Regions:
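Conserved NAD+-utilizing ADP-ribose enzyme module
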Residues: 1-37, 41, 71-152
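A glycine-rich, hydrophobic loop/mini-helix early in the fold
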Residues: 41-52
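Extended catalytic/binding region for NAD+/ADP-ribose chemistry, centered on the ART fold
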Residues: 51-76
Length: 152
């Protein structure tokens, strides 16, 4: 476990989905789990009573050490494409109205290091880059989460 008073900055992905009155960040692999605005996101585990994350268990908020590792996860959802006889993995074509955010995230509390990243107790977006989103959506997320958001 990493014990530090300074947050760890890592990378992760989010879906950007409309929830009633506004677009919100939603976990990339756990659908329908929205990240709260202007307050920390806290890991929960219904399997054990201890605070997440716990060694030997898969609970916690996941994040990658590098942007490249986060992009690799995104590519795994798209498959491989052939281009001029060479195999390439491309970022996915986005469905209309379903943008994705890749960005840096602050992690703190109980943090467990893994080979390619971390699992944390608490997290909050630090900086976001939208894939498939327009300037107006970037502005909405910027105001809602109070972080820098850039359309890609």
């Amino acid at each position: 476990m990493i014990a530090s008073g300074v947050p760890i900055i890592a990378w992760r992905l989010w879906h950007v989905r409309r929830h009633e009155d506004a677009y919100r960040l939603e976990s990339f692999t756990w659908h329908h789990v929205s990240w709260p605005a202007r307050t920390r996101f806290e890991a929960e585990c219904s399997t054990h009573g201890a605070a997440a994350p716990v060694r030997g268990h898969e609970c916690g908020i996941y994040a990658f050490r590098t942007r490249e590792l986060a992009e690799d996860l995104l590519r795994r959802y798209t498959g491989v494409r052939q281009h001029y006889g060479r195999t390439r993995q491309e970022l996915p074509p986005l469905r209309q109205g379903c943008p994705i955010a890749i960005g840096r995230v602050s992690l703190w509390g109980r943090v467990l290091a893994r080979e390619n990243g971390f699992r944390a107790q608490y997290a909050y977006p630090y900086e976001l880059f939208l894939i498939g989103g327009q300037d107006d959506l970037a502005g909405q997320l910027r105001r809602l989460y109070a972080v820098d958001v850039s359309p890609s």
